[in-house]
Amino acid sequence: MTNPYNWIEKSLETLHKANWYRSVKTIHSRSGSVVNLKGNLVINFASNDYLGLAGDERLINASIDAIKQYGTGSTGSRLLSGHRPIHRELENAIASFKQTEDAIVFSSGYLANLGTITALVGQRDLILGDEYNHSSLKNGSKLSGATVLDYEHGNLEDLNTKLVNYRRSYRRCLILTDTVFSMDGDICPLPQLLDLAEDFNCMVLVDEAHATGVMGKTGAGCVEHLNCSGRELIQMGTLSKALGSLGGYVAGSFQLVEFLRNRAATWIYTTGLSPGDTAAALTALNIIQAEPQRRQQLWENVGLLKEQLSGFNLFPSETPIICLGLNTPTEALILAQKLQDGGIFAPAIRPPTVPTSRIRFTLMATHQPCHFQRLGAVIR
């Protein structure tokens, strides 16, 4: 009798042959622009901690205080025994920050997308998503049971064509897009997309994971950055990137949030966000609004990185995500290792995560000019 698990080993062999195999890289220090990787100090260009808050003493102390008051875990779902006053404080703060009526906090950003999409649409509905959307948007779409169609990346003509051809055949239509695309660094054309949604009576859910805390006059995200704050849409984001904590949120109308509390399975049937993570995120929101100089420094650092990488094949980017395009996974792995040997941590990103191989640099407000000089010396 054949072993029913033998296929796993063969699949791993295929990954190795294609140079698609992945393994973790262990960091042995606090989050920061310089970290301890395998016993060596390296400059960290791989973190989503855009504002350098994950290692901030104020977040750490807020988390400790919350743990002392409420314990380490929420111990139940929010609808049973897992709700604490600090959860509602955070949700109110997010709603104020995002200029929406209300907000709801999930235990992760991935869960926020899965739960929201599957609550909003079903078998009689249509989902139209940007082909470069995050995995959580794509998997939420599959789980919903709706008909799912991708439109070409950032191509609103293609989106319009699909709306003309298919919208009338479905009860509801949900358009999904990242606002900042995490593996490319570009931004969606949100104002025009919202115009299309209004023309065809569609809902819109935007993923602000890499925009929250970074984009916009106050750091509220691309919705603010693109002057769309007063328009009707659903805003999702994370607490784990610029906010330096863990969790996800959805912000929108009172009715939307009340509906999700009753229909989003990934909120109803999972343990509430831990008190420590909740307190850290709440503290980060306050810091982001009180210290705009962090964002200013981040944008200055974006300019410094682009100076050092002038002449290389950089993807178009208006964000702190800068990608250097390469021809093959092997080239990406070789360059990533060269950088690491020179004290630079910037991992290779390869298929199937992305269509083409690249080195992805993410910037932090806490990077120093000498870090960029070092990068320039190593990469050339």
From Swiss-Prot:
Reaction catalyzed: 6-carboxyhexanoyl-[ACP] + L-alanine + H(+) = (8S)-8-amino-7-oxononanoate + holo-[ACP] + CO2
Binding site for pyridoxal 5'-phosphate: G109, Y110, S182, D207, E208, A209, H210, T238, L239, S240, K241
Protein keywords: Biotin biosynthesis, Pyridoxal phosphate, Transferase
A Pfam family assignment: Aminotran_1_2
InterPro entries: Aminotrans_II_pyridoxalP_BS, Aminotransferase_I/II_large, AON_synthase_class-II, AONS_Archaea/Proteobacteria, PyrdxlP-dep_Trfase, PyrdxlP-dep_Trfase_major, PyrdxlP-dep_Trfase_small
Any one biological process term the GO annotation gives: biotin biosynthetic process
Family to which this protein belongs: Belongs to the class-II pyridoxal-phosphate-dependent aminotransferase family. BioF subfamily.
This protein's name: Putative 8-amino-7-oxononanoate synthase
Name of the coding gene: bioF
